[in-house]
From Swiss-Prot:
It comes from the Archaea. Its cofactor is Mg(2+). Keywords: DNA replication, DNA-directed RNA polymerase, Exosome, Magnesium, Metal-binding, Nucleotidyltransferase, Primosome, Transcription, Transferase. One of its GO terms (molecular function) is metal ion binding. Mg(2+) 1 binds at E192, D234. This is DNA primase DnaG.
Length: 448
């Protein structure tokens, strides 16, 4: 009960505390062996400390001068006894407040009853004030930062947008959105819309032009015959349609795509750089994605020689390579088949420009765990197990193309590049961190 009283009383006291006066709050616990009232407690405090501490610390004089606040008392009487608290606000320094608190414990009578006074604590009121100040300052600081960041970001964004808008130009008869370098650059990047051009401008790429839909403008058709063209498209069906239209009416040298399901206008700087760095030559892109009809039509229309009709010898030797069986053969059969394959095709040919034939060969080599090296005419120079590929290529740097049934690793790319290899075809890509621009790397899952 005393606890409840003291808590509620504390609220009352804090409302009466003068914040300009109080430094410390003396909390004295009171016990009497009889029933007393509040005026008895206040009278005992003033009466029994009078003259005890000298004139400088006389409670009446201190209260008149404002150095001691109003004494608040909360007591409760039960079963002939009284307990409670007295709270004394002090504007004195630490030493004087401590002396005053100690003097209160000399009180031995309150009214007609024996009494005992104990100092429960002396609380530094300024600590709570400081804590409130800290909490409030944190909130104010957070609000300031939030508004400041918003303002800063807004200013930067506004300036950037204005700069980008001032840089974008209208090009050609169709007034196509384009970057300011479109007139002078030997290579151009063809994108879908105005926002794509703006996004690339934001990261300093200025040789861009937008087709504004699937109907390729005459301006872009003309530019494609004069410049090196990279088609940089969204990773969705719309990008596929624009690419097909581009192949039918214009020319393209490389293809770069946004990640599946994303648009060029959404890409970050890192994503843009990665996509353009690993752009794929148009013929390799079409073959890799199974667009054989488009590849054939594109090649014929642009008078390109992409592969040749296989002669009878090629067909006969290609038939030796069979599709891998559904059930893997026993180890003895694998070794025998591997030996036969190497023997029969030691002097064989592979149409390296025929994606279907290359794919079949990779599947067969994956079953055999073998790697083969071919010259530029598609004639096989030698073959060896996948595990020996890096060592064998570094020891005998011959050939133009590697076809492997294993994983294309970074080490294999590095060694092949040093050996003068131009193409690597494989089943899967390992962890690739860099690829020289002079070597083509194609896996049937993805390409670099």
């Amino acid at each position: 009960m005393v606890m409840l009283i003291s808590l509620s009383f504390k609220k009352v006291i804090w409302m009466n505390v003068d914040p300009n006066l109080t430094k410390y709050m003396i909390k004295a616990k009171i016990y009497t062996d009889g029933v007393v009232e509040k005026p008895d407690v206040v009278g005992a405090i003033f009466g029994q400390t009078e003259g005890l501490l000298g004139d400088d610390l006389d409670l009446r004089d201190l209260q008149k001068s404002g150095k001691i606040g109003r004494i608040e008392v909360e007591i409760d009487s039960k079963k002939g006894r009284t307990e409670g608290y007295a709270l004394i606000p002090s504007g004195l320094d630490q030493v004087e407040t401590a002396i005053l608190a100690a003097a209160l414990e000399t009180i031995d009578r309150i009214g007609p009853c024996k009494a005992k006074v104990e100092i429960a604590n002396v609380e530094d009121v300024r600590v709570q004030k400081r804590q409130k100040i800290i909490e409030r300052a944190k909130k104010i600081y957070q609000d300031m930062n939030s508004k400041g960041d918003d303002l800063s970001e807004s200013l930067v964004k506004s300036v950037r947008e204005e700069v980008e808008k001032s840089e974008i130009i209208s090009y050609g008869e169709e007034k196509l959105p384009a970057g300011p370098a479109i007139n002078d650059s030997d290579s151009i990047i063809v994108v879908e819309g105005r926002n794509d051009v703006l996004n690339l401008l934001k990261y300093g790429i200025k040789n861009t032009i937008a087709v504004q839909g699937t109907n390729i403008p005459e301006t872009v058709k003309k530019l494609s015959k004069e410049r090196t063209v990279t088609v940089f498209l969204d990773g969705d069906r719309g990008g596929d349609l624009i690419l097909k239209e581009m192949l039918q009416v214009a020319e393209a040298d490389f293809v770069a795509r946004a990640p599946p399901g994303t648009e060029v206008e959404e890409l970050t700087y890192k994503q843009i750089v990665k996509a353009l760095r690993y752009k794929t030559p148009i013929d390799q892109y079409l073959s890799m994605h199974g667009m054989n009809d488009e590849l054939k039509e594109y090649s014929q229309r642009n008078n390109l020689v992409f592969g040749s009709q296989p002669n009878n010898n090629h067909e006969a030797k290609a038939e030796v390579i069979e599709e891998p069986p559904e059930q893997p053969p026993k180890n003895e059969e694998i070794r025998e088949e591997q030996s036969q394959q190497v023997t029969v095709q030691k002097e064989g040919f592979l149409d390296l420009l025929n994606p279907h034939e290359v794919s079949k060969r990779i599947e067969a080599l994956a079953q055999l765990k073998m790697t083969e090296v071919y010259d530029s005419n598609g004639e096989r120079i030698f073959s060896f197990p996948v595990s020996e590929a890096v060592e064998r290529i570094s020891q005998d740097p011959r050939g133009n193309t590697i076809v492997t049934g294993g994983i294309i690793s970074q080490r294999l790319i590095d060694v092949s590049y040093n050996a003068g290899i131009k193409n690597i075809y494989g089943l899967k890509l390992g962890h690739i961190t860099k690829k020289p621009v002079d070597i083509n790397v194609i896996a049937w899952e993805r390409s670099l």
